[in-house]
Amino acid sequence: MLRRAFMAIVGCLALTCVALPAASSPSTQSPEEFVLKVSNEILDAIKKDPKLQQGEKKAVEALVDEKMMPAVDFLRMTRMAVGPKWREATPEQREQLQHLFRETLIQVYSGGLSMAKDQKVRILPRGQNDGTEAIVRTGMSSISDPGKPEVQMVYRLRNIKDQGWKVIDVNVEGVWLVSNYRNQYGNIAAQEGIEGLIRRMQDRVDHPETAKK
């Protein structure tokens, strides 16, 4: 489920075909504009690079660092995924946790980028925005097979001072992904401590076939 869900996130970020309004600065950009801007940039990169379409790790890492990481509050996402035990982690352990969470997502992204040539995304109504946090609802569908059911996704974003909107979680068909990881990581950290969680995360990065089961 998590693999499918993160593939959908990649699709949603990368596959929008909606035209953007005039460029806006981070401070004036709406959350909808932000999602569409990032999506178009990633879609363009994937269309131009066969290595990305094939899921080659170095190409995916470059895409993540250049396009995806600036679009998310990754420290907050990692902290949310780890749960209460994050407060007990040393600075060095926190760096390790962020690195391993990034590697985990890259492995999943690699399996979903080939979808980019056959998808489109639309903004759905009933979004929310109080100026500090926002909800952006989207629907992803196949271009070649429009009869396939639309996959609905919900972005949760936070407006960070001097940086603008950043993604902090994504809901794919009812599942909040960071919260889903929190259930896994939180249980491991509670039983085995932060070092135990780091070992488990490292093992899954080293042996991704285990994580797919």
Predicted segment positions?
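Positively charged n-region of N-terminal signal peptides that target proteins for export
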Residues: 1-4
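Bacterial N-terminal signal peptides
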Residues: 8-18
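Signal peptide processing junction and immediate N-terminal pro/mature segment
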Residues: 19-26
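Early exported N-terminus immediately downstream of N-terminal targeting peptides
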Residues: 28-109
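Extracytoplasmic
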Residues: 37-39, 55, 63, 69-72, ...
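Exposed beta-sheet edge and beta->alpha loop/turn motif
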Residues: 42, 127-195, 200
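A short, amphipathic edge element
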Residues: 113-126
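Cysteine/selenocysteine-centered motifs that mediate thiol-based redox chemistry or coordinate metal-sulfur cofactors
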Residues: 198-213
